[in-house]
Regions:
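Boundary/entry segment of secreted carbohydrate-active catalytic domains
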Residues: 1-20
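Short, well-ordered coil/turn segments that N-cap beta-strands
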Residues: 4-8, 35-37, 69-75, 137-142, ...
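Conserved, mostly hydrophobic/aromatic
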Residues: 10, 31, 39, 68, ...
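Aromatic- and glycine-enriched glycan-recognition loops and surfaces
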Residues: 15-32, 52-67, 122, 126, ...
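Short, acidic/polar
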Residues: 17-33, 126-130, 251-262, 325-333
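Aromatic-lined substrate-binding rim segments of carbohydrate-active enzymes
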Residues: 25-33, 40-103, 233-241, 464
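Polysaccharide-binding and catalytic clefts of secreted carbohydrate-active enzymes
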Residues: 101-268, 272-279, 283-292
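Carbohydrate-binding surfaces of carbohydrate-active enzymes
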Residues: 195-202, 240, 263-267, 274-686
Length: 686
């Protein structure tokens, strides 16, 4: 926990108000009133920090940092590569990105630069080093914020210029060595797409190649690598005169960049959380999505993360942008902390008067100062967080289950032309995660490079691609006593999207032989029974055969494949593996995972059934985490968050004895929660 306390604050843009000293003075006074203890500076300040090439003006920034320090407000200092000044693009137009259609962008928007460009890298490296030298040892500067929402330029973040084409070819040479290996990996003899010269290779383009999924996958990997390398360059630049940790702000399940690769350049994970609260009357789907994203960020490094941005109330970039209803700001903020965040930060502190984000929510609106509902909501969070500092310092969530979410698998599933063109990998994974969330079973969100040894249960929905070593890792996990769940259309292809021949890589573990995949329309949906209830088999129905010894729990009831298995369980070593051959609905996933949790010995922190809309998480001291398989440490002392996402009161029964960590109230057997309320509990000693 940075500074030993939870951070509360957000993006502060004083450069927009340098001609209004009374505003800057008022800002600090109101920050103290709102309980703000940390702000992020300099995110989009390049044009003010370097108004002319090589002419730096840091004095205004130093004055702001010093004034914040006098008020005991800490600073996260950004490098300003998120948006370029016009003098740069005018003098060096070659730094601007080239689109997939070959057209070079005009100046504008954000991140409109080539990550490969040596000139761009040199310019920002020099500026970053100067910032590091001037501010890297300031007492109240605690963290580097590298750029901003990398690749977030209203496109896919890729540049297709000749520099990038050349770098891509060199990357491919390093990966494959020879064109023969590349042609084999991309199945180049199909349609005579055999490359005989490295110069023939070009990035995917709407007026060029769009049908070779191996090329598409490698291009996406290359873009991630170039962007990660750029981020690493900035990390090294600020480290020249400073030993502060560094982060950059991620954007949930952002398809274009593999965050599991990018995170390797960072010391701390942070991200920007903008759930679509009040999209519908039922807030649970949005709560599940936000919880999934928080869990994914925490899981990347198995440590607390930072909520770098969130909206104090409204945003400005969806078709309709509802304000947060009373109670939702506190609940949404506490949800982040409950899942492992050591901060609640906002975009932004004060609304700007003009341009694109002038109507994006902020702590301070254009008028009325602190006399607004939003300010009061923020101030309430500012009062609550310090009460949790002592309890949460050094704590981390410690799930015993994991769900696979892998970027390369995502790219492959949605790029291929297969049984369906409308496969939605994140939606599929999220439907499985919801079954965990509703039971209060925490899960890490991991990729195929993760270590599985600390988990009792691993679920891998729609695991189409098997990276090298993944099958062996899963096999060892199950052999050693783990429970593995996977689904239809899994284990189909390798990392370059070449289909496996012969057998499924985990056929012996799963106990199932794949044969066909039916993608029925609604009129031809199938059905099956599980635990005495009927469920739909829809959209993807795999026609499989159970191997000898495999337990068939459900079969199709219709069509020519009636009697073929839908749900199977196979004992392998000390563990077991489940295969779900068809897509079904949430009702089935609830029933299925309820049984799996029981077999895995997984319970929520309250060890009770949760009402609809309620979930729980737990943070415990990292050095007190229960040892794997150690029953004596199962009732460790932790901090439990009980969250109600229903806009109505609920009662949680059968909870045992707990103490409210903030009020000291003792709860025995039941806990009553108001609408959109979060309770923070400590276990009562027996």
């Amino acid at each position: 926990m940075l500074g030993g306390h939870l951070l509360h604050g957000g993006d502060y843009n004083p450069e927009q108000w340098l001609d209004c000293p009374e505003i800057l003075e008022e800002d600090i006074r109101l920050m103290k009133e709102a309980g703000v203890n940390c702000v992020t500076l300099g995110v989009f300040s390049w044009a003010v920090l370097e108004p002319e090439e090589g002419a730096y003006d840091f004095d205004w920034l130093e004055e702001i940092i010093d004034n914040l320090g006098k008020a005991d407000i800490q600073v996260i200092l950004a490098t300003p590569s998120g948006a370029m000044p016009h003098w740069l693009t005018q003098k060096y137009p070659e730094v601007m990105q080239v689109r997939a259609d070959g057209q070079r962008n005009l100046p504008g928007k954000r991140h409109n630069f080539c990550y490969t460009s040596p000139l761009m890298r040199a310019k920002i490296k020099t500026l970053d080093e100067a910032l590091s030298e001037r501010f890297g040892r300031k007492e109240n500067v605690i963290l580097w914020h590298l750029s901003n929402e990398l690749a977030g330029n209203f496109s896919d973040g890729a540049c297709h210029c000749e520099l990038c084409q050349s770098a891509f070819r060199e990357w491919l040479k390093e990966k494959y060595g020879t064109l023969e290996e590349l042609n084999q990996a991309w199945w180049g003899r199909f349609w005579s797409h055999v490359y005989t010269d490295w110069e023939q290779i070009h990035s995917p383009a709407p007026h060029g190649e769009t049908t070779v999924t191996g090329l598409e996958l490698d291009w996406r990997r290359f873009v991630t690598e170039q962007l990660s390398d750029f981020c690493g360059m900035e990390r090294r630049a600020v480290a020249k005169y400073s030993d502060l940790p560094a982060t950059t702000n991620f954007m949930d399940t952002f398809k274009n960049i593999d965050y599991n690769r990018l995170q390797k350049e960072l010391d701390i994970i942070s991200w920007d959380n903008y759930p679509f609260w009040h999209k519908e009357k039922d807030e649970v789907p949005v709560a599940v999505q936000a919880a999934f994203n928080h869990s994914m960020m925490r899981s990347m490094r198995k440590q607390p993360f930072l909520l770098m941005e969130s909206a104090p109330s409204v945003i400005n970039w969806r078709e309709n942008n509802p304000v947060k209803r009373p109670g939702m700001h506190m609940l949404s903020s506490m949800q982040a902390v409950a899942h492992g965040s050591d901060s609640v930060q906002y975009f932004q502190w004060r609304k700007g008067r003009g341009s694109y984000e002038k109507f994006h929510g902020a702590v301070l609106d254009h008028k009325n100062g602190s006399n607004t509902r939003t300010f009061r909501d923020v101030a309430e969070v500012g009062k609550r967080l310090p009460k949790l500092d002592r309890l949460l310092d050094g704590t981390v969530n410690h799930p015993k289950a994991a769900i696979l979410f892998d970027w390369a698998n995502w790219w492959a599933v949605e790029d291929i032309t297969g049984p369906r063109l409308d496969l939605d990998y994140p939606a599929c994974v999220l439907s499985h995660y919801r079954a965990f969330w509703e039971k209060g079973i925490e899960a890490d969100i991991v990729d195929m490079d993760a270590d599985l040894s600390s988990y009792q249960l691993v679920s891998a929905p729609l695991n189409y691609m098997y990276k090298a070593g993944w099958a062996e890792k899963v096999k060892m996990f199950v052999e050693n006593g783990g429970i593995f769940v996977t689904t239809y259309f899994s284990g189909m292809a390798d990392e370059t999207d070449l289909c496996f021949t012969g057998h499924h890589p985990l056929e012996d573990v799963l106990g199932v032989i794949q044969e066909e995949i039916d993608a029925p329309s609604e009129e031809f949906e199938n059905q099956f029974a599980y635990a005495g209830q009927e469920y739909r088999a829809q959209r993807m129905c795999e026609i499989d055969h159970a191997k000898e010894g495999t337990e068939v729990l459900s079969v199709y009831e219709r069509d020519f494949y009636a009697g073929c298995p839908v749900v199977t369980r196979n004992r392998f070593g000390k563990g077991e593996a489940y295969y779900l051959a068809a897509e079904s609905d949430l009702a089935f996933l609830r029933a299925f995972y309820g049984d799996v949790f029981e077999r895995a010995g997984l319970k929520n922190a309250l060890d009770t059934e949760l009402p609809c809309g309620v979930t729980v998480t737990e943070r415990i001291c990292a050095d007190q985490a229960p040892a794997d398989g150690d029953a004596e440490t199962e009732k460790h002392k932790g901090v439990v968050f009980v969250m109600n996402f229903k806009n109505a009161p609920v009662c949680v029964d059968g909870i045992g004895r707990w103490t409210d960590a903030e009020s000291g109230t003792v709860y025995e057997r039941k806990l009553e929660l108001g609408a959109f309320q979060c309770a923070v509990l400590e276990r009562q000693a027996d």
